[in-house]
Amino acid sequence: MLSCVFSDTIFLSSFLAVTLICMTTALWGTILLISKQPLLSESLSHASYPGLLVGALMAQYVFSLQASIFWIVLFGCAASVFGYGIIVFLGKVCKLHKDSALCFVLVVFFAIGVILASYVKESSPTLYNRINAYLYGQAATLGFLEATLAAIVFCASLFALWWWYRQIVVTTFDKDFAVTCGLKTVLYEALSLIFISLVIVSGVRSVGIVLISAMFVAPSLGARQLSDRLSTILILSAFFGGISGALGSYISVAFTCRAIIGQQAVPVTLPTGPLVVICAGLLAGLCLLFSPKSGWVIRFVRRKHFSFSKDQEHLLKVFWHISHNRLENISVRDFVCSYKYQEYFGPKPFPRWRVQILEWRGYVKKEQDYYRLTKKGRSEALRLVRAHRLWESYLVNSLDFSKESVHELAEEIEHVLTEELDHTLTEILNDPCYDPHRQIIPNKKKEV
């Protein structure tokens, strides 16, 4: 099937155009995301709509149709830049909130575009059908000329981001610092604006004005979950954008639905634009779920693992407190009736499977119906007791907490005491022997 699909030159032009456009939008979408204005692409895409219509009308009635793409791109970019100027004016002069300014430009320019589209529909139905693709996208109509334009814009974007990378990064992250360094921030902001407008205008026929902003946001959002380094985010974002464009284009051609009209099954081609956006959204969703650093699933697993480890350590401390009271052989009844078990687990029954895990790890040894701590388990329990009492001492002596309120806090943070932190606390507290409740703090050799 792949060979049949890619042997079609018409599809190949559309495939390359959509893929390159999605990669370019992902690159500049990363810049918008880092500069905390991801919704700017939404406003600029809607602002370009009347410009696209004016360009199409100019090409239809004033100039030759062969030059239509030039005038459409020119007037579309002009309208987009003009819309950005109004956003800046409303924010700086009228003191309007930025989100309000974005919404104002979006609805006003889009309304003007709808009015122009109504005029075109009455005066030239053929032209209306052609320009209607700008609103919802029609990737199947993209030919060699559009693919060439997409390649030029992509290569120009790569060159601009490579040549002015440091300047754009500094301007994006800290504009005041960039001004202090003597950088011409207005120049680099204008450069970014021109490229973003150019990408929007050259890409609206692929996914449409309504959906193109998703291709600015989704790939960069997914890439941001995987790295903190901007250069890596740019590469991953472009990769995700390219994968989304390629998959969406291929699925729209390779898989068709069949609608029953009357008594006949009519093939229905899936729209490319929405499929591209769905693929980008799925990739971003997977990154949000499974990102090694901040993915929801990974964080959920970490929380569950920490909660499980904390309960296991509490069980170990229960064993130690009972054995510390001269009861070496511990029955199930002694265990669940101890005050420490009641403090940690309340009325819960004896956690046999958890104790079996402690036994498997070599912390506890079972002899007939009794349990006893091993040397390894006693050492680990003393480490936890030392951590708890060190934290209590630090909270009382260094942070002026009352000794009545530090027990619960120490119960939470005793599980995160590393060797380095133990050494630091020991130095700060001058290696104390007793905690605020006059209980002995085990030494570093795990001895009391």
Curated annotation (Swiss-Prot):
Family: Belongs to the ABC-3 integral membrane protein family.
Membrane-topology descriptor: Multi-pass membrane protein
Name of protein: Probable metal transport system membrane protein CPn_0347/CP_0413/CPj0347/CpB0354
Lineage, broadest ranks: Bacteria, Pseudomonadati, Chlamydiota, Chlamydiia, Chlamydiales
The entry's keywords: Cell inner membrane, Cell membrane, Membrane, Transmembrane, Transmembrane helix, Transport
Protein task: Part of an ATP-driven transport system CPn_0346/CPn_0347/CPn_0348/CPn_0349 for a metal.
GO MF annotation terms: DNA-binding transcription factor activity; protein dimerization activity; transition metal ion binding
Domain of life where this protein originates: Bacteria
